């Protein structure tokens, strides 16, 4: 499966929160990541599975 073509079920986004800030997440289709604006982190999605580990998250540039 091409990671660039994966999608996130909107129902899943309603359930998931950032493990650090407990805030809502949004899906970044271009980078295939779940983004926490509050924590300024982007969590990768690999093989259709969100990796919700702070240690795996990418910091968003200011």
Swiss-Prot record:
Protein name: UPF0434 protein Rleg2_3773
Residues annotated as signal peptide: none
Domain of life from the UniProt record: Bacteria
TM stretches of this protein: none
Annotated Gene Ontology cellular component terms: cytosol
Family listed: Belongs to the UPF0434 family.
InterPro entries assigned to the protein according to its UniProt record, in alphabetical order: Trm112-like
């Amino acid at each position: 499966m091409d990671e660039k073509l994966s999608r996130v079920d909107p129902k899943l986004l309603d359930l998931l929160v950032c493990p650090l800030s407990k805030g809502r997440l949004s899906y970044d289709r271009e980078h295939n990541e779940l983004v926490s604006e509050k924590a300024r982190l982007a969590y990768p999605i690999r093989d259709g599975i969100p990796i919700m580990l702070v240690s795996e998250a990418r910091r968003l540039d200011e």
